[in-house]
């Protein structure tokens, strides 16, 4: 009996010890989850009205360096910047009657306040099918293939979201809208990181399932998440449904993306048809290296065997339908972020919404990216703007409805219009000229907002009859990329004026990055890329920002309708 009692006591003690150990482990796990890295922004949150980011010129004695020589950036003066004074609003009367003067006109009523972000390009730097190699020589405009900022795309978005939250506390937004190219390579895991950052989830920007790297850019962190009071909406961009933003993913590309071998592809820079060829391995980032060294990239002849990586099925390409579906897998509002559940079945990425109760205004979200069938016009790729008859007919119906219902209208699309024929696919039906001519028949259309070019350009699209029908003119405002310098987003404040015209105030904002943070490092690398890669001059150089008051004439009907706001 004594032996049995001792055994029983021993068993009980053992169970208690195991339970205590389990509790300790659970406590450690809880502490671990609460101690996740966070990247708070700077205490002072300003817009470019107050302060701008001005790049410092590279010393004339510095050598030309290649984009991948990141460790040399600071040594030779690449990527340096300084804060500078802010820039005010430039008052634009381009689409107003020629005799119009705003001398005695005052801003009287606030109608709508919202923000736009675009071209975030969340990038899986360990994917075997990015196009890194084509950007390593610093050729013109090829920073789209590689830039040293690509390991930090998740961190920049997190900083921008926190900046929005701080501005929202000062003056609430009615909504926010993201203008396409949420991701870089049409991958599921890139899309999940994007949505999860906006939802405030834990982000692990490391897609190698066997990696133990702890460099700052792959370390798990807790995203802040967009303030839950702010509704956000989504636009489809070419990178969201095309491989590298240019090609419908072929079966070979789809297989490679989830495989263990780095993509071997032909020189698609010289000839887009080389997508089916071979000759160059695209490379990946060595995430154990401080500066994100590129490995497994170069001519096929330089390798004795194909370079390998660890496969991950979450890197898979997503169709339009699958891309839309992920916006229903979100904890922020609204459900689906503008898309209908029916669009999951159809892949139709157009919709409308009315952001403010009792305000006669609707936003028309238009998918103006090329079709997935890969049938492009001469010299066009999937990076061009286009409509097919279905989307054009839908757009016309929505414009007709908005006009007949007496509502002001904003079109939100990814690709801009009216900036040159090179931007629009010649195979589009309608043509760009036909589209613009149709838009000019709607006096209630006030604004077209877009991204795509990574610029902060503002374009006036004046009425075809400026003397008799000035209200047929409208404005186009582009929002720069969070990936490339100037790494900014935009605020919009639409106000009623004392003469019942309206003014659209648009303001650029730099994410309020904290010194020493990954997002601050990204800003420096973005500036360095703009100094290394030759290309078209940056609009509004050297800061790339542009703030404006855009005045728009309304019809007599709409002037009467909004005069009490």
Predicted feature descriptions by range:
Residues 26-168, 174-175, 234, 254-405, ...:
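Metal-dependent phosphoesterase/phosphodiesterase active-site architecture
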Residues 124, 184-186, 240-245, 372-374, ...:
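Active-site environment of divalent metal-dependent phosphoester hydrolases
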